[in-house]
From Swiss-Prot:
NAD(+) binds at residues 17, 38, 43, 69, 83-84, 105, 122-124, 147. One of its GO terms (molecular function) is L-lactate dehydrogenase activity. Keywords: Cytoplasm, NAD, Oxidoreductase, Phosphoprotein, Stress response. The active site is at residue 179. It catalyses: (S)-lactate + NAD(+) = pyruvate + NADH + H(+). Substrate binds at residues 86, 92, 124-127, 152-155, 232. This is L-lactate dehydrogenase 1. The modification Phosphotyrosine is found at residue 223. Homotetramer. It comes from Staphylococcus aureus (strain MRSA252). It is an enzyme of class 1 (oxidoreductase). It holds the Pfam family Ldh_1_N. InterPro entries: L-lactate/malate_DH, L-lactate_DH, L-lactate_DH_AS, Lactate/malate_DH_C, Lactate/malate_DH_N, Lactate_DH/Glyco_Ohase_4_C, NAD(P)-bd_dom_sf. Pathway: Fermentation; pyruvate fermentation to lactate; (S)-lactate from pyruvate: step 1/1.
Length: 317
């Protein structure tokens, strides 16, 4: 029996991130049905065939097909990976104008199908595009999720795990804020296998400089990867698959995603990366970590950066 029976995902955007996300869904049998939409119909046709050939080896049967926007009408989840890609030397915020125009069209097409599920947004700048998707769709805020800092937090945990020689799953540490240059680590609540990071650093003060460098590596990882191979895709695709799994399994899992704030962290009317409880209904609630003064100030700066960009966007006025 397929424990994910009835779970349908429509993927819009079959580039590197989208196609690897699609493979992750099939490989892990997270969905019952996967529909792929992209302007490049021939690539979709090829990927659908390739993915179908993988399904005999997936844990359960997954139906995969090429589709169109009308297929969204009974989808449980629409995942948007479409949009202009980030180029070397270009910040995520540089992509705003180009991708807002693309999203206005995409979300309009999806909603015209009578879609009544959850949106998951991965395209950059993800915080602004998640906000735009919420505005353009008219759906409740709980049903529009951005991938946020889920990848940044994974990078952060990985680097900390390597520094302390433990498994990444034994590290509890979050990156919050904009998925971009103004993001910040929540040092005050980071722990390694239950031991506060602050305590561990008191035992090895020479490690403080190394830890600070870990955040710089986390923040700048995308630029390094883009410079080396043109784009990042494996990590974010796995992050999207993890969010999808949390939704369909009704996990009440806490993940760092882009969510709308309505007073949490002293911020309003902005989608930004924060820990949130994810289940079958989307975002159950935002988890408000008590930040110290420095962290709160940096978070406010991150939120202001996003708000300032949105204030200039004609598509959001």
């Amino acid at each position: 029996m397929n424990k994910f029976k009835g779970n349908k995902v429509v993927l819009i955007g079959n580039g590197a991130v989208g196609s690897i996300y699609a493979f992750s869904l099939v490989n892990q049998s997270i969905v019952d049905e996967l529909v792929i939409i992209d302007l490049d119909a021939e690539k979709v046709r090829g990927d659908v065939m390739d993915l179908k050939h993988a399904t005999p080896y997936s844990p359960t049967t997954v139906r995969v097909k090429a589709g169109e926007y009308s297929d969204c009408h009974d989808a449980d989840l629409v995942v948007i990976c479409a949009g202009a890609a980030q180029k070397p030397g270009e910040t995520r915020l540089d992509l705003v104008s180009k991708n807002l125009k693309i999203f206005k069209s995409i979300v309009g097409e999806v909603m015209a199908s009578k879609f009544d599920g959850i949106f998951l947004v991965a395209t950059n700048p993800v915080d602004i595009l998640a906000y735009a998707t919420w505005k353009f769709s008219g759906l409740p805020k709980e049903r529009v999720i951005g991938s946020g800092t889920i990848l940044d937090s994974a990078r952060f945990r990985l680097l900390l795990s390597e520094a302390f020689d433990v498994a990444p799953r034994s590290v509890d540490a979050q990156i919050i804020g904009e998925h971009g240059d103004t993001e910040l680590p929540v040092w005050s609540h980071a722990n390694i296998a239950g031991q506060p990071l602050k305590t561990l650093l008191e035992q090895r003060p020479e490690g403080k400089a190394q830890i600070e460098q870990i955040f710089v590596q986390t923040r700048d990882a995308a630029y390094d990867i883009i410079q080396a191979k043109g784009a990042t895709y494996y990590g974010v695709a796995m992050g999207l698959a993890r969010i999808t799994e949390a939704i369909f399994r009704n996990e009440d899992a806490v993940l760092t995603v882009s969510a709308l704030l309505e007073g949490e962290y002293d911020e309003e009317d902005v989608y930004i990366g924060v820990p949130a409880v994810i289940n079958r209904n989307g975002i159950r609630n935002v988890v408000e970590i008590p930040l110290n003064d420095e962290e709160q100030s940096k978070f406010a700066h991150s939120a202001k950066t996003l708000k300032d960009i949105m204030a200039e966007a004609e598509e959001l006025k």
